[in-house]
């Protein structure tokens, strides 16, 4: 009798974000989720034009992309995609997932995002169709609980929460510190610190 074939489908994490700048919380989150779910790789996807952040100045996409490349370079499981940047127009998660599904048709996708963002998922474009494209992982500070009323019962098995202590770091705080001339060492990777300084980023518009 032939033994059943092992499940050979790859498991790929997709972490979308503005990454303005990327910080250690993003990297720890990717590593922890990869370990928790046995992911083969985690692809960081910097947004092109984030529709949720039209109320503040966002750094140029190329700067955010390069900072993400620098930050992830030392981890062979981490990769960076330009799919959202090169698509043009507003960035919507459903488009990201459809593009990734086309690129990796034989993989199980896990979309990694902040639990606070996940709490707003019903406001996202074509949000119900996204659950057929990926499992959603909300990373959060320890003790956070997602309101049971937010997600319809039918989709709750497609969502997991993972506590990440390092999520106490925020890009907003990093931008503000840089704007005020305060150090961001140990909040963001060394190469990103140097990139921010070289480019003089966040001096005029720290954002919110």
Swiss-Prot record:
Pathway: Cofactor biosynthesis; NAD(+) biosynthesis; deamido-NAD(+) from nicotinate D-ribonucleotide: step 1/1. GO terms for molecular function: ATP binding; nicotinate-nucleotide adenylyltransferase activity. It is an enzyme of class 2 (transferase). The lineage of its organism: Bacteria, Bacillati, Actinomycetota, Actinomycetes, Mycobacteriales. Its EC number is 2.7.7.18. Transmembrane segments: none annotated. The gene is nadD. One of its GO terms (biological process) is NAD biosynthetic process. It catalyses: nicotinate beta-D-ribonucleotide + ATP + H(+) = deamido-NAD(+) + diphosphate. Keywords: ATP-binding, NAD, Nucleotide-binding, Nucleotidyltransferase, Pyridine nucleotide biosynthesis, Transferase. Catalyzes the reversible adenylation of nicotinate mononucleotide (NaMN) to nicotinic acid adenine dinucleotide (NaAD). CDD domains: NMNAT (cd02165). HAMAP family: NaMN_adenylyltr. Belongs to the NadD family. It comes from Corynebacterium efficiens (strain DSM 44549 / YS-314 / AJ 12310 / JCM 11189 / NBRC 100395). This is Probable nicotinate-nucleotide adenylyltransferase. InterPro entries: Cyt_trans-like, NadD/NMNAT, Rossmann-like_a/b/a_fold. Pfam families: CTP_transf_like (PF01467).
